[in-house]
Amino acid sequence: MKEVISRDAALAALKEYNHEPFHIQHALTVEGVMRWYANELGYGEDADFWATAGLLHDIDFEMWPEQHCLKAPELLEKAGCDADLIHAVCSHGYGLVCGVEPVHEMEKVLFAADELTGLIGAAARMRPSKSVMDMEVSSLKKKFKDKKFAAGCSRDVITTGAERLGWTLEELMEKTILAMRSCEDSVNAAMAAL
């Protein structure tokens, strides 16, 4: 079992450098998605580690967007994170903003799911329910093909992420929708409490 800072300490570190509700909501979503994946893929004993990497993956993005994944090691070290967590967090920016390659399965999931949660979240907001609970893969695939929809979500990163995991794009979408369903209520409750 990997050692990890407490969730309270991780959340405090996130909020020290992130104030926009959108960024906090995204971090909480990726945290929940990563916890789901850890349990789903047989890494349940390391679920806290996976979730913490998800929570802190964009710790530097709001204040230092031009140094994304480059400023993070300093901030994470200050928060008490170890080298494994720092590597995991930075690896989600591989090929885009840094050269830290995702090697461990958790890092590959973070690389793929981070970008996909943005696309799924945007698609959910367009639904009458405003929820991922009734979203189907077929409707997400249509949004994925529409390059103008959620244009900031890189389809190349999502596709490359699926390939790195050895999954089809459809498998990645299906799993990530299920992961987002698992945490939607808790994320909404946390955001309402802010």
For the regions a protein language model found, what residue spans apply to each?
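Acidic/His-rich, divalent-metal-binding segments that scaffold phosphate/diphosphate chemistry
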Residues: 1-64
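Short polybasic/polar patches that bind polyanions
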Residues: 15, 39, 77, 145, ...
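A generic structural signal for well-ordered alpha-helical segments enriched in polar/charged residues
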Residues: 32-39, 74, 78, 182, ...
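Divalent metal-dependent catalytic cores for phosphoryl transfer on phosphate-bearing substrates
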Residues: 43-150, 159
